[in-house]
Curated annotation (Swiss-Prot):
Required cofactor names: Mg(2+)
Positions bound to ATP: 30-35, 233
Tree of life domain: Eukaryota
One function term, GO molecular function aspect: metal ion binding
Designated gene of the protein: OLA1
BP GO terms, sorted: positive regulation of cellular response to heat
General remark: Present with 36803 molecules/cell in log phase SD medium.
Designated name of the protein: Obg-like ATPase 1
Induction: By hydrogen peroxide and during DNA replication stress.
Family in the record: Belongs to the TRAFAC class OBG-HflX-like GTPase superfamily. OBG GTPase family. YchF/OLA1 subfamily.
Pfam families: MMR_HSR1 (PF01926), YchF-GTPase_C (PF06071)
Organism: Saccharomyces cerevisiae (strain ATCC 204508 / S288c)
NCBIfam families on file: redox-regulated ATPase YchF
Covalent crosslink: Glycyl lysine isopeptide (Lys-Gly) (interchain with G-Cter in ubiquitin): 98
Sequence positions bearing Phosphothreonine: 89
Organismal lineage: Eukaryota, Fungi, Dikarya, Ascomycota, Saccharomycotina
Amino acid sequence: MPPKKQVEEKKVLLGRPGNNLKAGIVGLANVGKSTFFQAITRCPLGNPANYPFATIDPEEARVIVPSPRFDKLCEIYKKTASEVPAHLTVYDIAGLTKGASAGEGLGNAFLSHIRSVDSIYQVVRCFDDAEIIHVEGDVDPVRDLEIINQELRLKDIEFAQKALEGAEKIAKRGGQSLEVKQKKEEMDLITKIIKLLESGQRVANHSWTSKEVEIINSMFLLTAKPCIYLINLSERDYIRKKNKHLLRIKEWVDKYSPGDLIIPFSVSLEERLSHMSPEDAEEELKKLQTISALPKIITTMRQKLDLISFFTCGPDEVREWTIRRGTKAPQAAGVIHNDLMNTFILAQVMKCEDVFEYKDDSAIKAAGKLMQKGKDYVVEDGDIIYFRAGAGKN
């Protein structure tokens, strides 16, 4: 008798399932968050105020994702009527303060805004400027990191303790029911999470089983969100790639947020560039012998969220679509329209690299590079797809 085919366990990702995921800009007050938001979104908010809580309700904007592949496809399908790039939704969340987890400084409202996003850009101030006050009195990025980390952890401990109390109530009923057994397992996991948080660690940086991830996702923990640390330098320090605080920041992140990325950038430089035409901005960067950090900041967050792209190309439109890694063809079709998912028949798939080489759909087909895939096909980053569906919907 042949051995049973092993069913591969589907990996469950931390966070909210879906393709339209959101990144929140987080940090203490007056570290450059709102100016960064204006630069990355090119959305003017007026002059960001030089005092805490200048932003109260989060601002939202969609950021175009830099994509050389999309640009190249638009050149190849240059007669297309419409070009639609991929976007990342970004929120500018008001500055946190020490004591936010206890409700100080409008803390509960701000923490609820963080809870509603899927990932975090944490902006850390590393520049000196006497005209921009620091809520803690002086510039000390490691202290600022510890404040934010502590406030998010304390709130998560509060969430976890409430979840533990709820699980305990059911577990105390006793008996051998499946629900009681599950709640006892949840209690063990939640106790483990609380100990982890009390040690200064973030939930996102720990290794969890798929079963544990499902429970963690139901708790909507703040520290379970992927985080990128944006180190806001002066223009001079960014260009020369030096700052006295960088080593200490790296040591702190390695210890308390291992595996998370640190990206140095300069809000003042990016803000200046945002007011220029693309040509003038390119000329300015050449003159300064540096590059903008924004493309890396945007694309790296998409990677942290496990987001990938597929494309649809034709005479009417070239479009880059965003999906979660591991998405199957019918669900990818559903991103375009629900009817395409419900009546899915097959997907005709080409690879970007083949389109770049052959530059013509008929030549790709003649070369045997056009593949037909069924409902179990897992879409790969860079696929160009023509979906075929029933009921006359293509």
